[in-house]
Each structure stands twice: as structure tokens, then as C-alpha cells.
Amino acid sequence: MLFLVISTPRPDKPSAVVAARRKWWSWMQPLLKSGLARAHYARVGRGAVALFDVDSTATLHRLINEWSEIIPAHYDVYPLLDPASAQKFLAKKGGRT
């Protein structure tokens, strides 16, 4: 299950959260290696974006909670279809169910 997660952190001074931001990058590395995260990017100005590939919403919930422990934020979560699944869906009856 693919999910795009976009964080909007609390409006703290950037200098006050440098250590937490470094910890977040370290926290992401094993997730990338394991495949739970496919990609991650810093947002211009504030925040981050991550693409998670998880087996369940419970796993996603755990990851977002871990992320929140490092950097408290508001999270926008978008479920995604991979390109092959989207094209397969469109090929069936013109995309109708």
C-alpha cells in the first residue's frame, strides 16, 4: 500500500530543531533500506515528504507516530496507486467498476 505523507511542523525557529531534523534523516535510513519508505524529501521552507510502501494502515500509523516523536507536525496522508495498478484499473471497462 503506497502512501504519500506530507508534514507541516510546528512553527518553531529552524535553529531550535536542528538536532531533531538530523535525527529524522537518520530515522529514515533503515526505512529506505527495508523498502518501507521508497523516497523522502525536505520541503522548501519547512517540513518533509515521504513515500511509504507499507503492508497495512497500522504500519503507517506506527511510522507516523514515530515521526511525530522526532518532529511534532501536522500530517497530510494521501493513498496512492502505483502506475501499473492505475493502468490495469483503467484498462478494465474504461475505468468503471
Per-segment meaning from a language model:
Residues 1-97:
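Conserved, structured core segments of small domains
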